[in-house]
């Protein structure tokens, strides 16, 4: 399945692909495009849009796209619920939601500065989410 979102990912646009690959669609292909092209590419490619305004898998109220994916795909795994709080705090204005959120935001911004290619950024940053998931499993 193809999934599409805005280019130059930050917290949610890396956390969501990690979540999708690990728990929803192991063969997922991610397309990163300019913001004004997301819906056109979604329609043309039959891709699922995420982390863009006015889509099912986007921000709703105080919750981020990571939360929307967990809800849609009924991912009730307790460590994922804990990780969702960390991601939400790092990706939204609720920076004090968890102690870990500010650190995740800083790490994610560092990855954006080091890696200019969006797909390489995903590949390099996924182990951070694997480690956070393990941490949340304790």
What are these regions (language model features)?
Residues 2-6, 13-74, 78-80:
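Conserved, aromatic- and glycine-enriched, well-ordered alpha/beta core segments
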Residues 12-13, 122:
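Active-site-proximal structural scaffolding
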Residues 71-138:
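A charged, amphipathic interaction segment
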């Amino acid at each position: 399945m193809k999934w599409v979102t805005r280019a130059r990912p930050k917290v949610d646009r890396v956390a969501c692909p990690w979540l999708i690959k690990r728990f929803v669609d192991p063969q997922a292909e991610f397309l990163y495009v300019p913001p004004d092209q997301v819906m056109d590419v979604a329609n043309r490619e039959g891709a699922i849009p995420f982390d863009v305004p006015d889509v099912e898998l986007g921000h709703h109220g105080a919750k981020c796209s990571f939360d929307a994916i967990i809800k849609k795909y009924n991912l009730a795994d307790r460590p994922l619920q804990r990780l969702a709080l960390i991601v939400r705090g790092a990706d939204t204005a609720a920076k004090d939601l968890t102690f870990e959120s500010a650190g995740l935001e800083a790490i994610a911004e560092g990855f954006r500065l080091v890696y200019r290619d969006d797909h390489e950024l995903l590949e390099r940053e996924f182990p951070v989410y694997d480690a956070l998931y393990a941490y949340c499993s304790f």
